[in-house]
Amino acid sequence: MRTYTPKPGDINRQWHVIDATDVVLGRLASQTAILLRGKHKATFAPHMDMGDFVIIINAEKVALTGAKLEQKRAYRHSGYPGGLTSVNYAELLESNPVRAVEKAIKGMLPKNSLAAQQLGKLKVYRGAEHPHAAQQPKTFEISQVAQ
């Protein structure tokens, strides 16, 4: 029996909406990365972009466990010598929660050329409103929430 390789026309993309209220950031990122890659589908192929579109709402209400708000730091570099800046997650979630969620999800995607395509299917919004109602997204529940 020959191995099935999906054709680009065989890919059926769904839209999922995830409410990030009180969901632990790592669990949210892990489940979202699985949906973006398409690993939940029976026709998954690691060399193709098989994933679905994911909308995350209420990014400002995401939870971090333990002392990560004060101890975990997000780094970025300007490209110039001495251009490394860092900020702790308490400040990052207050100023730009969308960036915090995108950074966590990007770290869980493969480090190859498909990652940019897969990240392009991710839409993160700070509040509860999103402009993708025409796509009729299905609600995706993440079972574990913060205590």
From Swiss-Prot:
Superkingdom of origin: Bacteria
UniProt keyword Protease present: no
Gene Ontology annotations for the cellular component aspect, listed alphabetically: cytosolic large ribosomal subunit
Range of residues in the leader sequence: none
Single GO BP term: negative regulation of translation
Molecular function terms from GO: mRNA binding; structural constituent of ribosome
Key words of the record: Ribonucleoprotein, Ribosomal protein
A Pfam family per the record: Ribosomal_L13
Subunit structure of this chain's protein: Part of the 50S ribosomal subunit.
General function of this protein: This protein is one of the early assembly proteins of the 50S ribosomal subunit, although it is not seen to bind rRNA by itself. It is important during the early stages of 50S assembly.
Family: Belongs to the universal ribosomal protein uL13 family.
Record's protein name: Large ribosomal subunit protein uL13
Organism this protein belongs to: Arthrobacter sp. (strain FB24)
